[in-house]
Amino acid sequence: MRTELFDFDLPTQNIALRPVSPRDAARMLVVRPSVPLEDRIVRDLPALLAPGDQLVVNDTRVIAAQLTGRRIGRGLEPKIEATLIKRLDGARWQALVKPAKKLLPGDVVRFGHDGRVCLLGHLDATVEAKGDAGEVTLAFSFHGPVLDQAIAEVGATPLPPYIASKRAPDAQDIADYQTMFASNEGAVAAPTAGLHFTAELETALAARGVGLHRITLHVGAGTFLPVKAEDTSEHRMHAEWGTISSGTAEALNAARAAGGRIVAVGTTSLRLLESAARDDGRIAPFADETSIFITPGYRFRAVDMLMTNFHLPRSTLFMLVSAFCGLDTMQAAYAHAIRTGYRFYSYGDASLLFRNDITP
């Protein structure tokens, strides 16, 4: 499909720079097939679900993946900004760096020159390899948990570019950009649909008889990358690591067999569930990378409903929701959201989507 079909105009005033408080007070647009759009709030979620339905959340935790440092060892020391995007082993990360032209294989970057100090000593990284799009492989001077601690001390929260271009990250983002489920470190972007949940909402869902299950997909920086191809068939999707335990898979399969619906909280949860689904719709245990790219025409096997934020024009995530509900339906839903002042992107409002081939 032509990627221009997934484009739309978004006024800058619709882009949220801070979340609402409390989190479950965010607006939520309910999109059902052949039913008028409905404006609700996230706190209404229990009333929109049925006993036996099963929510699936992503429990990944965002690391302090934004590092600032300087190249050392060969004359002038230019400032280097690095965003960690994929862990390769105990000491090596793949990263996006700016300005990439200032680095060559063999160069050493010392991070912490913005005033942050690593108590364990200098956090140095050697450039092992360099790609064509600003990607480098960094071999750090620390390893394993020691490296994790050093990154936490020196790094900053990696806000999405559409927020970071308008304001600098601050202490409030450390809390705001983590979900209440965040427990497994490894993401460089938050699974933002989960940001809407509160302890009170979780209690109300349990009282309604709705189950809640945790899976892990470590969200990569590729989630922010624009689709530059003119046709969806030409786009290469980024890979991310995910896990679904055997116990979770069994519980979801049993609930669905009993008539419960699987409700993915966020596109990351949906992509992982669909990656683990068999042709018969049963979910298998999973521990691997996934680069699944969902566009209109995809046959959903595991997920019946999707709670998700509002996404960028011409993005893989808008393509995904268009596959879930239909392109015309989602273009109309987004036009309504823009016209009525919904807040977009990571800190924005939510939508609750019913799959277009299932009668609500």
From Swiss-Prot:
Pfam families: Queuosine_synth (PF02547)
Tagged with keyword Cytoplasm: yes
Substrates-to-products reaction catalysed: 7-aminomethyl-7-carbaguanosine(34) in tRNA + S-adenosyl-L-methionine = epoxyqueuosine(34) in tRNA + adenine + L-methionine + 2 H(+)
Protein location: Cytoplasm
Pathway: tRNA modification; tRNA-queuosine biosynthesis
InterPro entries referenced in this protein's UniProt entry, alphabetically: QueA, QueA_dom1, QueA_dom2, QueA_sf
Molecular function (Gene Ontology), one example: S-adenosylmethionine:tRNA ribosyltransferase-isomerase activity
Example of a GO cellular component annotation carried by this entry: cytoplasm
Record keywords, A-Z: Cytoplasm, Queuosine biosynthesis, S-adenosyl-L-methionine, Transferase
EC number, as in UniProt: 2.4.99.17
Gene Ontology biological process: queuosine biosynthetic process; tRNA wobble guanine modification
Function, in words: Transfers and isomerizes the ribose moiety from AdoMet to the 7-aminomethyl group of 7-deazaguanine (preQ1-tRNA) to give epoxyqueuosine (oQ-tRNA).
PANTHER family per the UniProt record, alphabetical: S-ADENOSYLMETHIONINE:TRNA RIBOSYLTRANSFERASE-ISOMERASE (PTHR30307:SF0)
Protein family membership: Belongs to the QueA family.
Subunit structure: Monomer.
Stated name of the protein: S-adenosylmethionine:tRNA ribosyltransferase-isomerase
